[in-house]
Amino acid sequence: MSEIAHPTIQDGWFREISNMWPGQAMTLKVEKVLHHEKSLYQDVLIFKSTDHGNVLVLDNVIQCTERDEFSYQEMITHLAMNSHPNPKKVLVIGGGDGGVLREVVKHDCVEEAILCDIDEAVIRLSKQFLPHMSAGFEHPKVKVHVGDGFKFLEDFKNTFDVIITDSSDPEGPAESLFQKPYFQLLHDALREGGVITTQAENQWLHLPLITKLKKDCKEVFPVAEYAYTTIPTYPSGQIGFMVCSKDPNANVKVPLRSWSQEEEEKLCRYYNSEIHKASFILPTFAKKALE
């Protein structure tokens, strides 16, 4: 069988070049291209890297690597889940690799976790090539819906305790998930006291976008805060989240629920109650911009 070629791979190196981070590129050494297809919505590439395990790339942008995915998946999930007193019904928008689902079902209080992703190809290929992440799909509490998250949400009012939006960047199929009408849909789909997290880009590269995101969220939710995590294979090594609550008295910066240290170390490789608090502490330049 001939080797699979892809325009982002030259001389054995994958190059991630995007208008969203001009003048810089992330490169990973490729051991073998495992799969490439054009789905209905995006270009899907999966390759085995020499040092980061299998890598999922959508529209030429790294979504996850097996080496560092846990930082993102754990933080976007547990910042929301542990800011809610008793999350029983959880919705994941996007997240077709299954990583967020894997984290959601670590909480015994969860009775149902629904995932809605627009692209069946991401779900199908993650099950094939990212087994440690897609393990979440096999859990008995999980239901999967393939479709547009925006349209899916319109059918739900006062239904979910936590909604996690694990989207790609605001270009292509995920663009609408960064706009105010979407946050209103999230708000309306939550029960009283409900919490959301949503992927919210990078303080080094996207401060104007984050400033607008926070403003939009504040107009919809009484509580809206920006947190971030470190992750080596995302642009400039960080990614942020908006964490919002319908409860005006909520303090999402401090976990309402926490595991014992022993449980934490068993369940998580990145998240802990201390890092929950620390993730909201921003460097001066970002803090000033977001005030």
UniProtKB/Swiss-Prot annotation:
Gene (name only): spe-3
Species name: Neurospora crassa (strain ATCC 24698 / 74-OR23-1A / CBS 708.71 / DSM 1257 / FGSC 987)
Residues holding putrescine: Y72, D166, S167, S168, D169, Y234
GO molecular function: spermidine synthase activity
Classification via InterPro entries: PABS, PABS_CS, SAM-dependent_MTases_sf, Spermi_synthase, Spermi_synthase_euk, Spermidine_synt_N, Spermidine_synt_N_sf
Record carries keyword Transferase: yes
Catalysed reactions, as listed in the record: S-adenosyl 3-(methylsulfanyl)propylamine + putrescine = S-methyl-5'-thioadenosine + spermidine + H(+)
Residue positions binding S-adenosyl 3-(methylsulfanyl)propylamine: Q42, Q73, D97, D117, D148, G149, D166
EC number(s) per entry: 2.5.1.16
Pfam families assigned to the protein according to its UniProt record, in alphabetical order: Spermine_synt_N, Spermine_synth
Catalytic center residues: D166 (proton acceptor)
Family (UniProt): Belongs to the spermidine/spermine synthase family.
PABS domain boundaries: 11-246
A Gene Ontology BP annotation from the UniProt entry: spermidine biosynthetic process
CDD domains registered for this protein in UniProt: AdoMet_MTases
Residues spanning the signal sequence: none
Annotated keywords: Spermidine biosynthesis, Transferase
PANTHER family found in the cross-reference section: SPERMIDINE SYNTHASE, SPERMIDINE/SPERMINE SYNTHASE
Record-given protein name: Spermidine synthase
Pathway: Amine and polyamine biosynthesis; spermidine biosynthesis; spermidine from putrescine: step 1/1
